[in-house]
Every structure is written in C-alpha cells, then in structure tokens.
From Swiss-Prot:
Residues 442-456, 464-478 have a biased composition (Basic and acidic residues). Present with 319 molecules/cell in log phase SD medium. Belongs to the DNA mismatch repair MutL/HexB family. PROSITE patterns: DNA_MISMATCH_REPAIR_1 (PS00058). The gene is MLH1. Residues 422-480 are annotated as: Disordered. Changing residue 552 to L: Defective in a mismatch repair assay. This is DNA mismatch repair protein MLH1.
C-alpha cells in the first residue's frame, strides 16, 4: 500500500525552517544584531545568560518599530527591506528575507519592547510561533528596540542537547560581536554575562578600526598591522577592498579566523582564506598564523546573497579573478616591507650591559640593507639583554611559592622510624605491625608481559603485633610473630629498612585478560587530573574519618578523597606488578597464632553454620595455587584429609614498601574473596581479586574522638592522637609520594577531587594572602 502525499502542518513547516536558520544562540544574535545595524543604531548592548540559551537580550537605539507593524513582526516573509525579487540585485541591507524573528519565535519565547521617535511611549508585546500573544502594552522606554529571547530551543530537545557548554556558546557570541564591532564604523557594542558587573567586550562608537582590533583581540595584534587597500577595478565589478593585515613582525601560534565582510556581510570564503594564507606562508616563520581583516565591496548586481540559510556564504561574479587580485596585492604589500624585520634575540653575559655588544660601531658601519638588518638584530639583542638584567615585576597573585619536586625536611626523619627490629620490648601502636622476619617465594612460572621494567628483587616481609583493634577481632590483635632469634631458619640478612631482599627475576606476563585490563586503565586516564597528581604538594589531612586530604597544584588548592585515590592507586600497582609481588609473611612458629580462615569468617553473623563458611573456604582453597602464583596469597592446610576448617592464611602480597595494610580488615577480605569475586570468568576473576586487594590496602578511617570528654581514659585519648599522627605520617611520607610517581588518574574520580580555592581569586577578595 503506497503512502499518500499530505501537506505538512504549518507549525511543522515553521519549525523545520527555524532549524535551518537558527542553529545555535550565536545565529539568533547575529540576525538580531544585523537588524539593529539596519535600523541605524549607534549603540548595541547585548546581555547573555547561560550561553544565550536561558536569556539572550539585545538593545539598540535605532529607529524602532511602528506600533502598527507589531502584529506581523514575527510572521514569516515580512520585511521592510524588500518588495520584489529584483530588489535583491541592489540590496544594501543585512536583512531581506523576513525570516529571522519568525524563526526565533518558533523555537523560543520572544518579547519585543520598541519605540519610534514620534511615539510618546514604548510598546511591549510577546510572541510565540510567529503570532502576537496579546495587544501591545504601553511602557516607559527609550528610542530604539529591545528584543528578549528566552528559553531557546525549549521545544526542540535534540537541538538543545547538541549545543556545547554555556562557556563555549558564550565564546562564539563574543567572537561574532567582536567581528561586527571591528567592521561597523561609528557603532558601539557591549556584551556581558547576566549578573557580571564588568563587560566582556565594550567598544565605543568613536573608536577607530585600530582601536577596535586592540579591544577585541589584544595589543600585540593591533601594534603589528598595516593598512590594506585596493581601488576600484571596473572590469571585475570590484568597488574597493579595505582592511588591516598583519606585518611580518607579527607572532602568533594561535589561529585567528580571517574576518571577511563582502558588501558588509560577515562571510566565510575558503578560497580567499587559502589564497591569503599561502601568501603569508612565504613570509612568516613556520608555525605562525596571520591576522587578516578585509572589507570587500562588489557591485550588488554581481553578488548573489541568497545562497545560504544563515547568510554565511555569498557568490559573486569573477570570483577567481578578484581573489587573485587581492592575493597579488597582499604579496606586493608584504614584499615592500620585507627589507627589514625585527627579531627577538637575547644573549647571556656576566659583563656589564655596556660591554655586551659594540652597538655604536655597528650603527656606524650600517651602509647597506644587509648591515641595516644586522643592526636591528643587534639593537634588539642589546635591549632584550638589558631588560633581562632589570628585576622583573613579581606578580604576587600568580606566584607559586613551593616547588612540587622539593622534599620536606621531615621526610628525612621518617625512614628510621618505619620499623623496629630490637625485639618485642617496644611495640608499635595502632594497626601497623612490627616487621621482624622476611621470606620469599621462588616458584614463579615465566610469562610474557609487554612491560619495559628491568628484573628486580622480590620483597617479602613478616609482621607481628597488631594493636588497638576492636574486641571482636581480638585474635588478630593478639597475633604475634617471633623475633629473629626465635627462628633458626632465618639466615638471610635484614637491610636497614627492614626488608630481606632476595634476587628474583621479574616474571613476564602474557595473559590476554591482564593486557585488556591494562588497556582499560590507559583508556580511562584523565590527562589534566593526572598532571595535578604528578605535580602535587601535600598540604595535610583534613578529616581522618571521611578520609579527606588537601593538596596544592600550581595556584590551586584541592580537597580529595584519599580513600578513593588510594583504591585506584593500589589497583594500578596490582596490574603493573601482577605475578611479581613481594610477600608479607603472616604465619608464626606458634601454631595458636596462625590465621585460620574459618575463624575469620566466624565474625559474620550471616555465616551461622559450618556449611556456609566451608563453601567460601572451598572456593578460595580450590584456587590456592593461582592465588599464590599470581598474587602471593599463600594458603596452607595442616589438617587431616584437607579439612577446610584448618586452612590458614600464610602470606599477603606486598604492594608498597613501607606500608602494611590493616589486618583488622582480613575477615572482610576473605569474605569478599569468596562472595564478590566471579571465579568462572578469567578476566572478571583476575580483576575482582585485584580490586579486593586494593580495598584491603585502603588506609583505615579514624573515627573522631572528643579529647575534651572527661569520660574517656587517658589511654583512649592517647590512642586516638597516635592513630591520627600515624595516618598523617603514612600519607605524607609513603602514600602521596607514591601517588606522585605512579598514579594515573581515571576520569571517574573527578567527583572525588574538588577545587576549594585558587590564589588569584583569593587576592581579588583579600588583596593579599
């Protein structure tokens, strides 16, 4: 069955047409701004909110709109600038189709306030879908017109989603306003964001073209311009070409789109742009971008302005010849000034400025063009060297007062305090164990890994004595490891930092699953955030209970969730050192102190029967060889007939020297290994175990304690203070130095890093810091 052809509803037609003309807020503003210029306005003020999406208001002091014309103002094809099609051949105004306001009213809420010179008051009226909503209301107002556009694209969600950020849209608006401000002589422009006290752009009507370019761009652009002019060329229908182009001293790595006005219309002409850039490529140093502003006037009869919905393109007769004429003229202008050029040069010298260069001798010998160029270079070198000797003005509000690569003096005091090897008489507080013995595993199957790391030593350590753990974890708190003298098998020497190093070749890994996990980490890297962490300065702990710390980068102060950061850090270390971990040896010579998995799982009320505990232990025990080989998690079973109740945890992986995870979390570690890890899928399994190890390694929270509370004992207060000092020292001397060296920040932790202050803004408020 064939579909019947039907006429589209008028509202659908109007929305389609509006979508072709009004693509973004900047298109709506351009149309309204051109109407203001056509109305002979001498001042145009623009107000923008949320990139022009929420509010876009333009106010001019032009001729205004007659009250009688208001009912049809926003209807399509209503205009005061054109009566018949032949008038297009002589059109001199920006507008001619009568579609701009109509299109805007179909995708936004429009309110117009206008007053002509003859009226005693202004008139205000609102529009929707091209129709006037109510009769015009008299209001107070000045001569001219104010058009308020609100909620742009409120009825086209797809177009709204396609727009870029508010700042990007506002930048586009500023760019277009600036280009019209440069070209529109005797017309002033201002543009600012809603709520801002200062204008983002302000151009007075009396400004010259040079002043306008200086205001819109900057001084370096305006001070390196030459005037460009071509007189009338009869056979090409070319009336004139006037503008400003950069000279050969102009240096800019940033590309500035050429400003082309053809018959006073802002257009893009790719052929002309390429031709002029080609000319400049013969003169400017490689990598420099030129500045070009040209106003081209062509006989209106030779120009077709009705070729693009947004009027950004025009077609004209003798296009190739006109472009060639302009390019040749530019070549001639640049050739004329290519006899001399100023270069920035500097010299390093310890002598007095007068002895740097024999400047007078060089000037006296200036007899020809070559020596003139040499003199210019010498003069500039002398000036630069002289200025370098002067003390540069220090900008206090942009001064970075600390060096991220410089260590604090306290970092040299911590190494001797990390471990104690003098026996069991002196016991560490908190959950950090005292290291007394180290062993290592020599079994490691060689795999292939795309890593560039050299073979290194395998690090393994023993730990003992956990203090101040919750009562229900008493068996971990009582756990002790005998001193070195108690074990005759310890024949390996202990280094000053408390580790026994045994030469062990690095295992090469060629597992596809691990490669994919590493690629996934690489793909998730946020470059800017990684740079912040790589060049951070650690400030201190803000809240030990919520695991918040402050860091500084450059001129900014950030608040970070160090728990989240450490989780990602240890996961990445696990991926990098996969199958190459050192060992933390947990098993004691005293059998009663061994860590039995069954006892650890007894901490959980939901595992109230032997079967549920043994189910978890069975999963882990079945994978014990893999856990030992890949993760240095060694399990042993001394029971008869491999009784699952006798499975013991002998070792944990060592991810970072100087840091031992809190063994208080061992019950949760074993529980989650059995419950949360997917043991069926290889990649999910390897990833899940690494994440559980990273979770184990996250520093403990330190619950807040009111030290002024009289009900607390002195031991409890001292314990709280010691735990705070311990976590602070651990973060400053162990974890954050590792974060600076190794951490690749993923995008999803952006929510865990918050900028709380920056130096320039603080100076704006306090005028000092």
């Amino acid at each position: 069955m064939s579909l019947r052809i039907k006429a589209l509803d008028a509202s659908v037609v109007n929305k389609i047409a509006a979508g072709e003309i009004i693509i973004s807020p900047v298109n709506a503003l351009k149309e309204m701004m051109e109407n203001s210029i056509d109305a002979n306005a001498t001042m145009i003020d623009i107000l923008v909110k949320e990139g022009g999406i929420k509010v876009l208001q333009i106010t001019d002091n032009g001729s205004g709109i007659n009250k009688a014309d208001l009912p049809i103002l926003c209807e399509r094809f209503t205009t005061s600038k054109l009566q018949k099609f032949e008038d297009l051949s002589q059109i001199q105004t920006y507008g001619f189709r009568g579609e701009a306001l109509a299109s805007i009213s179909h995708v936004a809420r429009v309110t117009v306030t206008t007053k002509v010179k003859e009226d005693r008051c202004a008139w205000r009226v609102s529009y929707a879908e091209g129709k006037m909503l109510e009769s015009p209301k008299p209001v107070a107002g000045k001569d001219g017109t104010t058009i308020l556009v609100e909620d742009l694209f409120f009825n086209i969600p797809s177009r709204l989603r396609a727009l870029r950020s508010h700042n990007d849209e506002y930048s586009k608006i500023l760019d277009v306003v600036g280009r019209y401000a440069i070209h529109s002589k005797d017309i002033g422009f201002s543009c600012k964001k809603f709520g801002d006290s200062n204008y983002s752009l302000s151009v007075k009507p009396s400004y010259t073209v040079q002043d306008r370019i200086r205001t819109v761009f900057n001084k370096s652009v305006a001070s390196n311009l030459i005037t460009f002019h071509i007189s009338k060329v009869e056979d090409l229908n070319l009336e004139s070409v006037d503008g400003k182009v950069c000279n050969l001293n102009f240096i800019s790595k940033k590309s500035i789109s050429p400003i082309f006005f053809i018959n006073n219309r802002l257009v893009t002409c790719d052929l002309l742009r390429r031709a002029l850039n080609s000319v400049y490529s013969n003169y400017l140093p490689k990598g420099n971008r030129p500045f070009i502003y040209l106003g081209i006037v062509i006989d209106p009869a030779a120009v077709d302005v009705n070729v693009h919905p947004t009027k950004r393109e025009v077609r004209f007769l003798s296009q190739d010849e006109i472009i060639e004429k302009i390019a040749n003229q530019l070549h001639a202008e640049l050739s004329a000034i290519d006899t001399s050029r100023t270069f920035k040069a500097s010299s390093i010298s310890t002598n007095k400025p007068e002895s740097l260069i024999p400047f007078n001798d060089t000037i006296e010998s200036d007899r020809n063009r070559k020596s003139l160029r040499q003199a210019q270079v010498v003069e500039n070198s002398y000036t630069t060297a002289n200025s370098q000797l002067r003390k540069a003005k220090r900008q206090e509000n942009k001064l970075v007062r600390i060096d991220a690569s410089q260590a604090k003096i306290t970092s040299f005091l911590s190494s001797s305090q990390q471990f104690n090897f003098e026996g069991s008489s002196t016991k560490r507080q908190l959950s950090e164990p005292k290291v007394t013995n180290v062993s290592h595993s020599q079994e490691a199957e060689k795999l292939t890994l795309n890593e560039s790391e050299q073979p290194r030593d395998a690090n393994t350590i023993n730990d003992n004595d956990l203090k101040d753990q919750p009562k229900k974890k008493q068996k971990l708190g009582d756990y002790k490891v005998p001193s070195i003298a108690d074990d005759e098998k310890n024949a390996l020497p202990i280094s000053k930092d408390g580790y026994i190093r045994v030469p062990k070749e690095r295992v090469n890994v060629n597992l596809t699953s691990i490669k994919k996990l590493r690629e996934k980490v690489d793909d998730s890297i946020h470059r800017e955030l990684t740079d912040i962490f790589a060049n951070l300065n650690y400030v201190g702990v803000v809240d030990e209970e919520r695991r918040l710390a402050a860091i500084q980068h450059d001129l900014k102060l950030f608040l970070i969730d160090y728990g989240s950061v450490c989780y990602e850090l240890f996961y990445q270390i696990g991926l990098t050192d996969f199958a190459n971990f050192g060992k933390i040896n947990l098993q004691s010579t005293n059998v009663s102190d061994d860590i039995v998995l069954y006892n650890l799982l007894s901490e959980f009320d939901e595992l109230n029967d032997d079967a549920s505990k043994e189910k978890i232990i069975s999963k882990i025990w079945d994978m014990s060889s893999m856990l030992n080989e890949y993760y240095s998690i060694e399990l042993v079973n001394d029971g008869l007939d491999n009784d699952l109740k006798s499975v013991k945890l002998k070792s944990l992986p060592l991810l970072l020297k100087g840091y031992i995870p809190s063994l208080v979390k061992l019950p949760f570690f074993i529980y989650r290994l059995g419950k949360e890890v997917d043991w069926e899928d290889e990649q999910e399994c390897l990833d899940g175990i690494l994440r559980e190890i990273a979770l184990l390694y996250i520093p403990d929270m330190v619950p807040k304690v009111d030290t002024s509370d009289a009900s607390l004992s002195e031991d409890e207060k001292a314990q709280f203070i010691n735990r705070k000092e311990h976590i602070s020292s651990l973060l400053e001397h162990v974890l954050f130095p590792c974060i600076k060296r190794r951490f690749l920040a993923p995008r999803h932790i952006l929510k865990d890093v918050v900028e709380i202050a920056n130096l320039p803004d603080l100076y704006k408020v306090f005028e000092r810091c």
